[in-house]
Amino acid sequence: MSVNLLLGLQWGDEGKGKIVDVLTQSYDIIARFQGGPNAGHTLEFEGVKHVLHTIPSGIFHPKAINLIGNGVVIDPVIFKKELENLTPYNIDFTSKLLISKKAHLILPTHRLLDAASEASKGKAKIGSTLKGIGPTYMDKTGRNGMRVGDIFTKTWKKRYNTLVKKHLRMLEYHDSCLLYTSDAADDSPSV
């Protein structure tokens, strides 16, 4: 069995999804191994354009199994909308789409942290999509994020609430930094 890999080495939209869609029509498995719901990849199926943010590009291929690996961060709201947008095509997601239980979940507070972090950088901001992807990866590497498999445990609510409380403390810190920098700017002498 051979394995082929299409790996993008740029930031942002470089056309990976479109290329994967063209190249993978005869492949059995199409996998996403990292990333999150940024700009998305645009595909055309039955004359209709679709923008997929999380679901792999091979979802329209009749025999392909699509994998979302543990390196992917998933926003449940965006993911649900993607699934709903594809329901008219009668895709059997239970057999065509597999998701790692170790993939991390983007929470609403991750989005807030992303926005607060970006705002605190002022002119040095990086141009984040504000989707909460960076803060989710911070929780992943810090080993305290929520994973897909966590929602099937009895303690998921406690785990969720603990993480949200941590995020709220971080947001308070960002707010105080913004107040400090804006106060300092107000007090600086004009030239």
List each model region and its residues.
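Residue-level marker of positions within ordered structural domains that often coincide
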Residues: E84, D186-D187
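N-terminal low-complexity segments that are often proline-rich with Ser/Thr-Pro
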Residues: P189-V191
